[in-house]
């Protein structure tokens, strides 16, 4: 299928099958399609609404163009689509560090800030991590520590061919959905936060086509009417759980896990330096209850999808114990010591 045929089909409201979408996205990644046609394609997809087969095909194409690090041990990722407008601190990044302290292997995929003041790369860099490690050094570090950050521009170099169009458009497009689906390590266990309740089931169907093992795709809401691409300690969380090919959808509340309900204002973040300080406060056991609850909620889910614990509740308890025993801070300090000694 040519880009011209795809555009005409989209104008008629047609859905691209996954192979057609994969072909078009591959041409985009290869720099073979003009910026104006890329823009038209993205806008028409957005206007009609992206479908499961299209998201799957696009993700396949991008992964096929990515540099894939070989990371053994079935690592997990905690990642969100962004776009919730909540401006919280980096909850999923903090949770990934605490889950690692619990014994979970982590391949955290991320980038600098796009829709918020501080992206996962920004806050980790502010904490002292080297974020832009090449493939070889990433693989070696993972063997030693079981925790790595996969900086998107390093592993997805072909994305540079669409970056100017995305920036100039200034609209949410299919690429805003794809970030959590294109971890270059091809993680099979994930916590994915999405900006729309409708996306939880769609993402589960996409991940099932990728033969993912155990994933929680979730959308949080607040009692004040806001939304979160995180599990919510401020209201309900809608979850589509994919486990060994089966999807079930349900709703949970903080109280289901012994957590208090908090105001979203208590989770607000700032720039990279401020968010790094917030994470250190949590690790030092000086974080306000709301912040600690938000982090252990996600970390507990990470323990659950990694099958380190048989339930989310037990994962939450394990994550909180890691903080209160000092094990989480010690784990992060050991990681930072490794990063300080890296020679690239």
From Swiss-Prot:
Binding site for anthranilate 1: 80, 111
Residues given in the record as anthranilate 2 binding sites: 166
Coiled-coil intervals, chain numbering: none
Cofactor notes: Binds 2 magnesium ions per monomer.
Pfam families xref list: Glycos_trans_3N (PF02885), Glycos_transf_3 (PF00591)
Residues annotated for Mg(2+) 2 binding in this entry: 229-230
Binding site for 5-phospho-alpha-D-ribose 1-diphosphate: 80, 83-84, 88, 90-93, 108-116, 120
EC class: transferase
Cellular component terms (Gene Ontology): cytosol
Gene3D superfamilies: Nucleoside phosphorylase/phosphoribosyltransferase catalytic domain (3.40.1030.10), Transferase, Pyrimidine Nucleoside Phosphorylase, Chain C (1.20.970.10)
EC number: 2.4.2.18
InterPro entries in the cross-refs: Anthranilate_Pribosyl_Tfrase, Glycosyl_Trfase_fam3, Glycosyl_Trfase_fam3_N_dom, Glycosyl_Trfase_fam3_N_dom_sf, Nuc_phospho_transferase
Subunit structure: Homodimer.
Name the record gives this protein: Anthranilate phosphoribosyltransferase
Organism for this UniProt entry: Chloroherpeton thalassium (strain ATCC 35110 / GB-78)
Upper classification of the organism: Bacteria, Pseudomonadati, Chlorobiota, Chlorobiia, Chlorobiales
């Amino acid at each position: 299928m040519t880009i011209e045929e795809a555009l005409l089909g989209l104008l008629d409201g047609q859905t691209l099958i996954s192979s057609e979408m994969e072909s078009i996205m591959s041409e985009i990644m290869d720099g073979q399609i003009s910026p104006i046609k890329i823009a038209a394609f993205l806008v028409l997809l957005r206007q009609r609404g992206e479908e499961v087969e299209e998201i799957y095909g696009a993700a396949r194409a991008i992964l096929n163009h990515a540099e894939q690090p070989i990371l053994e041990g079935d690592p997990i990722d905690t990642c969100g689509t962004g776009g919730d407008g909540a401006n919280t601190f980096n909850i999923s990044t903090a949770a990934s560090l605490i889950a690692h302290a619990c014994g979970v292997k982590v391949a955290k995929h991320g980038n600098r800030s796009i829709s918020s003041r501080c992206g996962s790369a920004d806050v980790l860099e502010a904490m002292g991590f080297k974020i832009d490690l090449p493939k070889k050094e990433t693989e070696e570090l993972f063997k030693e520590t079981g925790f790595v950050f996969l900086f998107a521009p390093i592993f997805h170099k072909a994305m540079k061919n669409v970056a100017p169009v995305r920036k100039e458009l200034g609209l949410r497009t299919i690429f805003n959905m794809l970030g959590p689906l294109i971890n270059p390590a091809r993680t099979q266990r994930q916590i994915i936060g999405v900006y729309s309740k409708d996306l939880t089931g769609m993402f589960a169907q996409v991940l099932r086509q990728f033969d993912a093992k155990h994933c929680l795709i979730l959308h949080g809401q607040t009692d004040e009417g806001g939304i979160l691409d995180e599990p919510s300690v401020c209201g309900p969380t809608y979850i589509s759980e994919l486990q060994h090919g089966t999807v079930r959808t349900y709703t949970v509340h903080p109280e289901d896990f012994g957590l208090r309900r908090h105001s979203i204002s208590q989770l607000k973040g700032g720039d990279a330096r401020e968010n790094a300080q917030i994470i250190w406060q949590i690790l030092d056991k000086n974080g306000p209850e709301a912040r600690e609850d938000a982090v252990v909620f996600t970390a507990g889910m990470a323990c659950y999808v990694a099958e380190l614990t048989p339930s989310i509740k037990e994962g939450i308890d394990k994550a909180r114990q890691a903080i209160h025993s000092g094990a989480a801070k010690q784990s992060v300090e050991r990681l930072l010591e490794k990063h300080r000694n890296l020679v690239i």
